[in-house]
Structure formats: C-alpha cells, structure tokens
Amino acid sequence: MMKIKKIAMQLCLSSAVLAAMPAFAAEAVQLSARHYVVKNLNIGDLPVKTIVPITAKTAEQAIAQAQVIASNPNADVAEFRIDLLEFSADTKKVIALGQQLNQILKEKPLIATIRTHNEGGKMTVSDQDYEKIYREYLKKPFMQLLDIEMFRNAGSVAKLTKLVHVKKVLVILSNHDFSK
C-alpha cells in the first residue's frame, strides 16, 4: 500500500510540474532528460520520491518536524502545510518560518501549501485573499514548489502561476475531491 501511495504522489508531482514549468530555465531548476531537478533532486527519476508533510500548529513543532525530515534519508521532499499553523494568517511569521524550514531541510525541496477548507484543509479564505497571501509569500520565496488549488478563480490561478514562474519557483496545480 505504501509503495502505491509513493508512486501516485510521484506521478502527480511530476505531471503537475511538467505541466506548469516556466518557459525559461530557472537557476535552481533544470530540465534533465524530461525530468526536473530541484535542489539536486531529480523529481522524475526512479526510485520514486517520498513527500513528507510538515503538519505543525506551532513554529517549534514545524522546526522539529523539519529536523526529522532533514535527517531521514528516506524523505525526499517536505510539504509545509501552512493552513495547519495557529498563525497561518500572519504572512510575516509564515515567511520567517518557511525560510527557517528551508535552511533546515538543506538539499531537500520544500513545497508550500495552503489547503483550503473546500479541499480538505483548515483555512477558509476567499479567492482574492488566497491570491493575496501567496503574493506575499512570493515577495520572499522560501519554497521551491508552490501548491496552487487549480479550481480556484481561474484569473487568480493564472496570475499566480505567472508570478510563480517569474520568481523561479515550480507550480503544483492540485485538486482534492473527497466526494469521489
């Protein structure tokens, strides 16, 4: 069962990254044999990659989880679930923590994710505020990949995707439908 989950995660990540790669070559991201290299990790190569979530409520818990991920050779990528933080609405605190996590993780890529209530997360936010929050994060990008919910307002998704590419960050377009 775990192997299937790893493969599904890797395929989803590769497909989303391939679909959303910017037209230019980013400094930290290189196209290599139709795969993407992020912090020296070739996302498309075998073995499949393991994404481990950071699901903390506090900064201290997030730092502790990142330290465990950083020291685990079986963890390839960390996903920072921002919506689970007690201070998720405070963009300055989130950015500062994201920068710390990125340093702790060293060569392991960091995905920044706000999972909204509509898709099984903890944050309830309008399309306008969702875009505004991500724009704030992108002023000082701390992530290598940004998870954008693909069925939010189409204009917001398009604008965010364009900005993410300008900032040389990869996009993961996601959809979580728990009714199917």
Spans of model-derived segments:
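Bacterial N-terminal signal peptides that target proteins for export
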Residues: 2-12
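N-terminal signal peptide c-region/cleavage motif recognized by signal peptidases
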Residues: 20-22
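N-terminal amphipathic alpha-helix/helix-capping segment at the start of soluble metabolic enzymes
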Residues: 25-61
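Active-site mouth loops of central-metabolism enzymes
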Residues: 48-65, 116-128, 172-180
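Structural preference for beta-strand elements that scaffold enzyme active sites
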Residues: 49-51, 77-79, 109-113, 143-147, ...
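Catalytic beta/alpha-barrel core
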Residues: 79-87, 142-156, 172-180
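Active-site-adjacent beta->alpha loops and helix N-cap segments on the catalytic face
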Residues: 86-101, 150-164
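Glycine/small-residue-rich loop that forms an oxyanion/phosphate-binding "nest" at active or ligand-binding sites
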Residues: 112-147
